[in-house]
Design a protein with these regions (language model features):
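Ribokinase/PfkB-type carbohydrate-kinase core domain
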Residues: 1-6, 58-60, 66-69, 86-221, ...
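Short, hydrophobic/aliphatic alpha-helical segments
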Residues: 9-14, 224-226
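Substrate-binding N-lobe of the ribokinase-like
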Residues: 5-7, 14-80, 84-89, 94-100, ...
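Residues at secondary-structure transition points
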Residues: 20-24, 50, 76, 152, ...
Length: 289
Protein backbone atom coordinates (compact mmCIF):
# COMPACT_ATOMS: atom_id res chain seq x y z
CA UNK A 1 0.00 0.00 0.00
CA UNK A 2 1.40 3.37 -1.01
CA UNK A 3 1.65 5.84 1.86
CA UNK A 4 0.30 8.80 -0.09
CA UNK A 5 -2.79 10.04 1.78
CA UNK A 6 -5.49 12.49 0.71
CA UNK A 7 -7.57 13.89 3.59
CA UNK A 8 -10.88 15.32 2.38
CA UNK A 9 -13.21 17.80 4.04
CA UNK A 10 -13.36 20.79 6.31
CA UNK A 11 -10.58 23.27 7.01
CA UNK A 12 -11.82 25.94 9.37
CA UNK A 13 -11.24 28.30 12.24
CA UNK A 14 -12.20 27.07 15.72
CA UNK A 15 -13.35 30.23 17.50
CA UNK A 16 -12.84 30.10 21.28
CA UNK A 17 -13.29 32.82 23.90
CA UNK A 18 -9.50 33.20 23.88
CA UNK A 19 -9.20 33.56 20.10
CA UNK A 20 -9.27 31.45 16.94
CA UNK A 21 -7.31 28.30 16.12
CA UNK A 22 -6.86 26.56 12.78
CA UNK A 23 -8.61 23.20 12.64
CA UNK A 24 -11.06 20.86 10.98
CA UNK A 25 -10.73 17.10 11.34
CA UNK A 26 -9.30 16.31 7.85
CA UNK A 27 -6.76 19.12 8.17
CA UNK A 28 -5.77 17.98 11.67
CA UNK A 29 -5.31 14.39 10.51
CA UNK A 30 -3.24 15.44 7.50
CA UNK A 31 -1.05 17.73 9.62
CA UNK A 32 -0.23 14.96 12.10
CA UNK A 33 0.42 12.45 9.31
CA UNK A 34 2.94 14.85 7.79
CA UNK A 35 4.57 15.37 11.18
CA UNK A 36 4.90 11.58 11.41
CA UNK A 37 6.65 11.43 8.04
CA UNK A 38 3.68 10.40 5.87
CA UNK A 39 3.14 12.14 2.53
CA UNK A 40 -0.31 13.67 3.00
CA UNK A 41 -2.37 16.42 1.35
CA UNK A 42 -5.67 18.11 2.19
CA UNK A 43 -8.61 18.44 -0.19
CA UNK A 44 -10.71 21.36 1.03
CA UNK A 45 -12.11 24.75 0.13
CA UNK A 46 -11.81 28.21 1.67
CA UNK A 47 -13.57 31.46 0.92
CA UNK A 48 -12.23 34.42 -1.02
CA UNK A 49 -11.95 36.41 2.20
CA UNK A 50 -9.37 37.44 4.85
CA UNK A 51 -9.96 34.28 6.94
CA UNK A 52 -9.25 32.16 3.88
CA UNK A 53 -6.10 34.14 3.23
CA UNK A 54 -4.96 33.43 6.79
CA UNK A 55 -5.49 29.71 6.24
CA UNK A 56 -3.41 29.76 3.06
CA UNK A 57 -0.67 31.67 4.91
CA UNK A 58 -0.71 29.05 7.68
CA UNK A 59 -0.35 26.26 5.11
CA UNK A 60 2.65 28.07 3.65
CA UNK A 61 4.17 28.58 7.11
CA UNK A 62 4.00 24.84 7.87
CA UNK A 63 4.98 23.80 4.33
CA UNK A 64 1.61 22.11 3.84
CA UNK A 65 0.86 21.51 0.13
CA UNK A 66 -2.00 23.59 -1.26
CA UNK A 67 -2.52 21.56 -4.46
CA UNK A 68 -6.11 20.80 -3.48
CA UNK A 69 -6.94 23.82 -1.32
CA UNK A 70 -9.57 25.42 -3.53
CA UNK A 71 -11.22 28.84 -3.22
CA UNK A 72 -14.97 29.41 -3.48
CA UNK A 73 -15.93 32.69 -5.16
CA UNK A 74 -18.81 33.54 -2.83
CA UNK A 75 -19.22 31.20 0.16
CA UNK A 76 -17.23 32.20 3.29
CA UNK A 77 -14.36 30.45 5.00
CA UNK A 78 -15.70 28.16 7.71
CA UNK A 79 -15.82 29.18 11.36
CA UNK A 80 -16.91 26.97 14.27
CA UNK A 81 -17.83 28.37 17.67
CA UNK A 82 -16.22 26.21 20.38
CA UNK A 83 -17.34 26.03 24.00
CA UNK A 84 -15.29 24.24 26.66
CA UNK A 85 -16.64 22.83 29.92
CA UNK A 86 -14.71 22.70 33.20
CA UNK A 87 -12.95 19.48 32.13
CA UNK A 88 -11.86 21.01 28.82
CA UNK A 89 -14.33 18.94 26.78
CA UNK A 90 -15.36 20.78 23.63
CA UNK A 91 -18.79 21.28 22.08
CA UNK A 92 -19.20 22.90 18.67
CA UNK A 93 -21.60 25.21 16.85
CA UNK A 94 -20.92 24.59 13.14
CA UNK A 95 -22.17 27.37 10.89
CA UNK A 96 -23.44 26.95 7.32
CA UNK A 97 -23.28 27.34 4.38
CA UNK A 98 -19.51 27.65 4.01
CA UNK A 99 -16.90 27.11 1.32
CA UNK A 100 -16.31 23.41 2.03
CA UNK A 101 -20.02 22.70 1.47
CA UNK A 102 -19.34 22.90 -2.28
CA UNK A 103 -16.02 21.11 -2.85
CA UNK A 104 -15.47 20.04 -6.44
CA UNK A 105 -12.20 18.73 -7.88
CA UNK A 106 -11.26 19.75 -11.43
CA UNK A 107 -10.20 16.78 -13.57
CA UNK A 108 -11.19 14.33 -10.83
CA UNK A 109 -11.14 11.47 -13.33
CA UNK A 110 -7.37 11.95 -13.70
CA UNK A 111 -6.67 11.86 -9.95
CA UNK A 112 -4.93 8.76 -8.57
CA UNK A 113 -5.91 8.12 -4.95
CA UNK A 114 -4.01 5.66 -2.80
CA UNK A 115 -5.34 6.28 0.73
CA UNK A 116 -8.49 8.42 1.00
CA UNK A 117 -9.51 9.78 4.42
CA UNK A 118 -12.93 11.40 4.69
CA UNK A 119 -15.38 12.33 7.43
CA UNK A 120 -19.13 12.46 7.84
CA UNK A 121 -19.41 16.19 8.59
CA UNK A 122 -18.30 17.45 5.17
CA UNK A 123 -20.93 15.19 3.60
CA UNK A 124 -23.77 17.29 5.01
CA UNK A 125 -24.19 19.02 1.62
CA UNK A 126 -25.12 17.24 -1.65
CA UNK A 127 -22.34 18.76 -3.78
CA UNK A 128 -19.49 17.86 -1.44
CA UNK A 129 -21.03 14.45 -0.74
CA UNK A 130 -21.08 13.72 -4.47
CA UNK A 131 -17.36 14.53 -4.66
CA UNK A 132 -16.64 12.29 -1.66
CA UNK A 133 -18.44 9.34 -3.22
CA UNK A 134 -16.55 9.82 -6.49
CA UNK A 135 -13.19 9.92 -4.68
CA UNK A 136 -14.14 6.95 -2.51
CA UNK A 137 -14.89 4.87 -5.61
CA UNK A 138 -11.44 5.67 -7.07
CA UNK A 139 -9.39 5.06 -3.92
CA UNK A 140 -7.27 1.98 -3.35
CA UNK A 141 -7.85 2.20 0.43
CA UNK A 142 -10.54 4.17 2.26
CA UNK A 143 -10.67 5.55 5.81
CA UNK A 144 -14.01 6.82 7.16
CA UNK A 145 -13.74 9.12 10.19
CA UNK A 146 -17.21 9.24 11.73
CA UNK A 147 -17.94 12.57 13.44
CA UNK A 148 -21.63 12.76 14.30
CA UNK A 149 -22.45 16.43 14.77
CA UNK A 150 -26.13 17.25 15.34
CA UNK A 151 -28.05 18.00 13.11
CA UNK A 152 -25.71 17.05 10.26
CA UNK A 153 -26.23 13.30 10.10
CA UNK A 154 -28.84 10.60 9.62
CA UNK A 155 -28.88 6.80 9.57
CA UNK A 156 -29.35 6.81 5.80
CA UNK A 157 -26.42 9.17 5.25
CA UNK A 158 -24.03 7.25 7.50
CA UNK A 159 -25.03 3.93 5.94
CA UNK A 160 -24.38 5.29 2.45
CA UNK A 161 -20.88 6.34 3.46
CA UNK A 162 -20.01 3.33 5.64
CA UNK A 163 -20.27 0.61 3.00
CA UNK A 164 -17.28 -0.12 0.75
CA UNK A 165 -14.86 1.25 3.34
CA UNK A 166 -11.69 -0.44 4.60
CA UNK A 167 -11.10 1.40 7.90
CA UNK A 168 -13.57 3.16 10.20
CA UNK A 169 -12.86 5.28 13.26
CA UNK A 170 -15.47 6.51 15.74
CA UNK A 171 -15.90 7.15 19.46
CA UNK A 172 -17.80 4.94 21.88
CA UNK A 173 -20.94 7.11 21.83
CA UNK A 174 -21.06 6.98 18.03
CA UNK A 175 -20.53 3.21 18.12
CA UNK A 176 -23.44 2.78 20.52
CA UNK A 177 -25.78 4.89 18.37
CA UNK A 178 -24.91 3.23 15.06
CA UNK A 179 -25.07 -0.24 16.63
CA UNK A 180 -28.52 0.57 17.99
CA UNK A 181 -29.67 1.53 14.48
CA UNK A 182 -28.76 -1.90 13.13
CA UNK A 183 -28.57 -4.26 16.10
CA UNK A 184 -30.85 -2.96 18.88
CA UNK A 185 -30.28 -4.83 22.11
CA UNK A 186 -26.68 -5.76 21.33
CA UNK A 187 -24.59 -4.40 24.19
CA UNK A 188 -20.87 -4.13 24.84
CA UNK A 189 -18.21 -2.38 22.81
CA UNK A 190 -16.55 -5.53 21.47
CA UNK A 191 -19.85 -7.15 20.46
CA UNK A 192 -20.98 -3.96 18.71
CA UNK A 193 -17.64 -3.56 16.90
CA UNK A 194 -17.81 -7.12 15.57
CA UNK A 195 -21.45 -6.83 14.53
CA UNK A 196 -20.99 -3.57 12.63
CA UNK A 197 -17.72 -4.66 11.01
CA UNK A 198 -19.38 -7.82 9.70
CA UNK A 199 -22.43 -5.88 8.51
CA UNK A 200 -20.50 -3.20 6.60
CA UNK A 201 -17.44 -5.26 5.66
CA UNK A 202 -14.83 -3.14 7.47
CA UNK A 203 -11.30 -4.54 7.72
CA UNK A 204 -10.33 -2.24 10.60
CA UNK A 205 -12.63 -0.74 13.23
CA UNK A 206 -11.09 1.77 15.65
CA UNK A 207 -13.10 3.01 18.65
CA UNK A 208 -11.90 5.69 21.06
CA UNK A 209 -13.30 5.91 24.59
CA UNK A 210 -11.72 9.12 25.85
CA UNK A 211 -10.00 8.66 29.20
CA UNK A 212 -11.09 4.99 29.23
CA UNK A 213 -8.76 3.99 26.36
CA UNK A 214 -9.37 2.65 22.86
CA UNK A 215 -10.11 -0.56 20.94
CA UNK A 216 -9.21 -1.84 17.49
CA UNK A 217 -10.71 -4.80 15.66
CA UNK A 218 -8.56 -6.25 12.86
CA UNK A 219 -8.37 -9.73 11.36
CA UNK A 220 -10.99 -10.95 13.83
CA UNK A 221 -8.93 -9.88 16.84
CA UNK A 222 -9.68 -7.05 19.26
CA UNK A 223 -6.93 -5.16 21.05
CA UNK A 224 -7.38 -2.61 23.84
CA UNK A 225 -5.02 0.02 25.20
CA UNK A 226 -5.50 2.29 28.21
CA UNK A 227 -5.23 6.03 27.77
CA UNK A 228 -2.13 7.92 28.91
CA UNK A 229 -2.91 9.99 32.03
CA UNK A 230 -2.40 13.69 31.30
CA UNK A 231 -3.56 17.04 32.59
CA UNK A 232 -6.21 17.99 30.02
CA UNK A 233 -5.83 21.43 28.44
CA UNK A 234 -8.73 20.76 26.06
CA UNK A 235 -10.02 17.92 23.89
CA UNK A 236 -9.99 19.83 20.58
CA UNK A 237 -8.52 17.58 17.90
CA UNK A 238 -7.62 14.72 20.24
CA UNK A 239 -9.59 12.17 18.20
CA UNK A 240 -8.01 13.46 14.99
CA UNK A 241 -4.56 13.02 16.50
CA UNK A 242 -5.48 9.50 17.55
CA UNK A 243 -6.59 8.57 14.04
CA UNK A 244 -3.46 10.10 12.50
CA UNK A 245 -1.18 8.34 14.96
CA UNK A 246 -2.83 4.99 14.29
CA UNK A 247 -2.88 5.41 10.51
CA UNK A 248 0.74 6.57 10.38
CA UNK A 249 1.82 3.48 12.30
CA UNK A 250 -0.38 1.22 10.16
CA UNK A 251 1.13 2.59 6.95
CA UNK A 252 4.53 1.72 8.43
CA UNK A 253 3.21 -1.83 8.96
CA UNK A 254 3.14 -1.94 12.75
CA UNK A 255 0.82 -4.41 14.47
CA UNK A 256 -2.65 -3.30 15.54
CA UNK A 257 -1.63 -3.25 19.19
CA UNK A 258 1.47 -1.16 18.46
CA UNK A 259 -0.60 1.22 16.33
CA UNK A 260 -2.93 1.73 19.30
CA UNK A 261 0.00 2.56 21.58
CA UNK A 262 1.42 5.14 19.18
CA UNK A 263 -2.03 6.67 18.59
CA UNK A 264 -2.65 6.95 22.32
CA UNK A 265 0.67 8.71 22.87
CA UNK A 266 -0.06 11.30 20.19
CA UNK A 267 -3.62 11.91 21.44
CA UNK A 268 -2.28 12.47 24.96
CA UNK A 269 0.32 14.90 23.62
CA UNK A 270 -2.39 16.97 21.91
CA UNK A 271 -4.86 16.77 24.81
CA UNK A 272 -2.25 18.20 27.17
CA UNK A 273 -1.96 21.32 24.99
CA UNK A 274 -4.48 23.93 23.89
CA UNK A 275 -5.76 23.46 20.35
CA UNK A 276 -5.40 20.69 17.79
CA UNK A 277 -2.17 21.66 16.00
CA UNK A 278 1.28 21.30 17.57
CA UNK A 279 4.49 20.27 15.85
CA UNK A 280 5.99 16.93 16.87
CA UNK A 281 8.11 15.82 13.90
CA UNK A 282 11.03 13.71 15.06
CA UNK A 283 9.80 13.52 18.65
CA UNK A 284 11.69 10.77 20.48
CA UNK A 285 8.95 10.73 23.11
CA UNK A 286 6.19 9.99 20.57
CA UNK A 287 8.33 7.71 18.35
CA UNK A 288 6.11 8.09 15.28
CA UNK A 289 8.94 7.93 12.73
Amino acid sequence: MAADVLCFGEVLWDVLPTGKLLGGAPFNVSFHLQQAGIDSKVISQIGNDPLGGEIRAAFDKWNIPTDYLFMHPSLPTSQVTVELDEQGKATYVIHQPVAWDEIQIPNLQELDINVFVFGSLACRSPKTRETVLACKAKAAYTVFDINLRTPFFSKERIDELAFDVDFVKMNDEELELIADWHFPGEEGIEIQMKALSAHFGWKTCLVTCGADGAYVLENGEIHFVSSVPVKVADTIGSGDAFLAGFLAAKLKRYSGEKCLQKATALAAFITSRKGAIHEHAGSVELDLD
